[in-house]
Amino acid sequence: RTGRVTPVLEIEPIELSGALVGRVTAHHAGNVKALRLGKGAIIAVERSGEVIPKIVEVIKPATRTIIVNKCESCGYELTWQRDFLICPNHSECPAQIENTLEHFFKTHGQVDGFGSKSIEKLVTAGIDTLEKIYNSTEEDFQRSGFGPGQSKNLRLELNRSLKVEIEDWRFLSAFGIPQLGQGDSRRLLQNIQFDELSKVTKEEIIAIEGFAEITSADIVAGLKNKWSTIKYMLGLDFKLSKTQLLLESTLINSPISGMKVVFTGKMLQSSR
C-alpha cells in the first residue's frame, strides 16, 4: 500500500518446525544487495516464533545479484528510497490500491466482507476508492460480480460501520498514511485536533516528542495526498471517539481544576 516492494526469496524447500518452507522474505532490496542474495547463495533460515521464516546467516553469497527495476503489478519504473525500492504509481498501481483499501477495512475492524478477494473484485470492476465503495448500492455490487445476498450484506456492513463507535486515532491510521500507524496516530491526535491536520506543518509535528524530521515530512505529504478522501469519509459522520488533547488532560488533572479563584482588594489599573 505504500509502494514499497518487498523481495521474497525462493529457496529449496526445507522443513522447519514441522512446516515445509520454500519462500523467505529478504525484507528490502537494500538487504538483497548488501548480503548478495541471489541464485546459488547458501543461507541459514529459521522460523521466528515458529511462524515467519527469516534469514539468520548468509553462508555463501551469490556470485550475481539481480534487482528488479519494474513494478510487477503495474509495470512502472521503480525508484530507490533509502534501502527500499518504491513504485511511484500510487494512484493507479492495482497492488497499492487493493492493499490500501484492504488496510482500511482491516484496521477499522468493524466491517465484514471486505477481504482481499472482495477488494480485488471491486477494483477490477472500477470501484477502486473508499469514496466509490461507500457510495455503492446493492446493484453496483451485483454488477461487480457479487451475488444478491452478498451484495445486500456488503451494503449493510458499510451502513453499520458508520454507527459503530471507533477511536479517531484508529480511523486516522486506517488510511495507510506512511509513517502513521496506530501508535503515532494517537500521539499526533493527543497534540493536534483532527480537523487541523489538513494544514499541519512539518515543524509542528517535529515539536511533538517521538517524531523525527524525515518521519514528519512523510506524514505531512501523506496527509496532503489523502486529505480529500479523509474529508469525504469524515462527511459520512462516522461515530468517532475523540482523543483527549494532552493540554486538556493536564488542565483537568491540575490541583486547582474546577476551583473558583476570587481576588479582593484594590487594583492599581482598571476595575475588577
Regions found by a protein language model. Give the residues of each.
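A residue-level signal for conserved active-site and pocket-lining positions in enzyme catalytic cores
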Residues: 3, 40, 115, 181, ...
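DNA strand-break repair and replication-stress modules
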Residues: 125, 144, 150-272
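Alpha-helix N-cap recognition
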Residues: 28, 129, 194-196
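Generic recognition of flexible, low-complexity loop/linker segments
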Residues: 31-32, 42, 108-109, 173-175, ...
